[in-house]
Amino acid sequence: MKTGIIQQSLSGFYDVIADEKIYRTRARGNFRQRKIKPVVGDHVEFSAENQQEGYLLKILPRRNQLVRPPVANVDMAVVVTSAKEPAFSANLLDRQLIALEAQDVTPLIYFSKTDLLTDDEYQQLLPTIEGYRKIGYQVYAAREPFDSDQLANLMEGLKGNIVTMMGQTGAGKSTLLNHLAPQLKLATGEISQALQRGRHTTRKVSLLDVNGALIADTPGFSSYETFDMTVNDLPQLFPEMAKISADCKFRGCLHIKEPQCAVKEAVNNGIIMKSRYNDYLQFHELIANQKPNYKK
């Protein structure tokens, strides 16, 4: 019996990294019976007499699991955020950030397509960039999106971690990976003018060994509707709100209608970004109104 990490999932086969080799495996039937689905990033026990015919025996406990993209035991996520074509969406960025906060994954925000902005448009984006930095997020937003110093700094921070690339379809995840590791030659697709959505250029989930980091290149998406947290958990997923919520008059303050709320005061004083607070209110309403998801 061996232990390893699932490096790729494709059509019922799972490629496992172990002993600096890759073993192709299948899941035993009892996984299906117990409705357990192995995902990329899983630490597994498996048997294999050769590198082509192995079987997964056990999935070891997961530290976390992202639903979209489906990756387990993630340390960091590079949220590739388009500045233009498709247009920047703070709401989509915040949806992704709270999903990562809920799973205890460290987000890194990477603005792509900044070179498509006019100088005026770039200047207008800078306060937003600085706003996310002020919260504590690491933000990469050079005027040239693939600036060599910026890429080197990003790569240095990713080494030794399981990393997922996530972001809106067409945001440039594959393009960024191609700049980090040109030898990969990943497929990239031009934006569909009709839908303003990218053609999905990625059809499988893989962990790519890029200069010492295991990076998932995964299908893009056009929206992000996964809200697995409660309304009471939500304020803690906005770090800038969690930081000052102790100053609210009422414990468990949801920062909506409560009097003497430190968070609302911080929004009014420009300490907390208005766009973030508006997204918080929208997410709160969505979570409060969504139907319970009973897992079988």
Swiss-Prot record:
Its EC number(s): 3.6.1.-
Subcellular location: Cytoplasm
Source organism, top-level taxon: Bacteria
Cofactors, names only: Zn(2+)
Pfam families, alphabetized: RsgA_GTPase (PF03193), RsgA_N (PF16745)
Keyword rRNA-binding on entry: yes
EC category: hydrolase
Keywords of the record: Cytoplasm, GTP-binding, Hydrolase, Metal-binding, Nucleotide-binding, Ribosome biogenesis, RNA-binding, rRNA-binding, Zinc
CDD domains to which the protein is assigned, alphabetical: S1_YloQ_GTPase, YjeQ_EngC
Binding, Zn(2+): 248, 253, 255, 261
UniProt-listed GO biological process terms: ribosomal small subunit biogenesis
Family matches, as SUPFAM superfamilies: Nucleic acid-binding proteins, P-loop containing nucleoside triphosphate hydrolases
GO terms of molecular function: GTP binding; GTPase activity; metal ion binding; rRNA binding
InterPro entries listed in its UniProt record: G_CP_dom, NA-bd_OB-fold, P-loop_NTPase, Ribosome_biogen_GTPase_RsgA, RsgA_GTPase_dom, RsgA_N
Gene3D superfamilies xref list: Nucleic acid-binding proteins, P-loop containing nucleotide triphosphate hydrolases, Probable gtpase engc, domain 3
Cofactor note: Binds 1 zinc ion per subunit.
Residue positions binding GTP: 112-115, 167-175
GO cellular component, one term: cytoplasm
Function: One of several proteins that assist in the late maturation steps of the functional core of the 30S ribosomal subunit. Helps release RbfA from mature subunits. May play a role in the assembly of ribosomal proteins into the subunit. Circularly permuted GTPase that catalyzes slow GTP hydrolysis, GTPase activity is stimulated by the 30S ribosomal subunit.
Family from the record: Belongs to the TRAFAC class YlqF/YawG GTPase family. RsgA subfamily.
Subunit structure: Monomer. Associates with 30S ribosomal subunit, binds 16S rRNA.
Protein name per Swiss-Prot or TrEMBL: Small ribosomal subunit biogenesis GTPase RsgA
